[in-house]
């Protein structure tokens, strides 16, 4: 009787493992398809932004910038951590602030009043 019980448990475990492997395969196939769709969408967005940049002769969205004039008309140069440089003189010598925190980038104009103030885009 014990042998039959062990055999049935083994079959059940094998069946459960097989179903789990099928589920894992289906999920991995779905994730691969999702990654491909995401890549295609991001390529389309990049192409559109590059075309916009060519039309305006300006930097596309999320490019590094120094001022509003290098960004496109509907973008502005945003420096989220512009005050970080002022903190550097107060930090000990061993503490370094990464350059990524000092980086400014072209961002979309928003409703909060953050707009491109460059003279060449004013009408």
From Swiss-Prot:
Expressed by the venom gland. It is found in: Secreted. Residues 17-54 form a propeptide. Residues 55-122 form the Oxytoxin-type inhibitor cystine knot (ICK) domain. InterPro entries: OXYTX_ICK. GO terms for cellular component: extracellular region. PROSITE patterns: OXYTX_ICK. Its main location: secreted. Disulfide bonds join 58-72, 65-77, 69-118, 71-106, 79-104. Keywords: Calcium channel impairing toxin, Disulfide bond, Ion channel impairing toxin, Knottin, Neurotoxin, Secreted, Signal, Toxin, Voltage-gated calcium channel impairing toxin. The primary structure of the mature peptide is identical to that of omega-oxotoxin-Ol1a from Oxyopes lineatus (AC P0C8M0). Weak blocker of vertebrate P/Q-, N- and L-type voltage-gated calcium channels (Cav1 and Cav2). Is both paralytic and lethal when injected into lepidopteran larvae. Is not toxic to mice. This is Omega-oxotoxin-Ot1a. It comes from Oxyopes takobius (Lynx spider). The lineage of its organism: Eukaryota, Metazoa, Ecdysozoa, Arthropoda, Chelicerata.
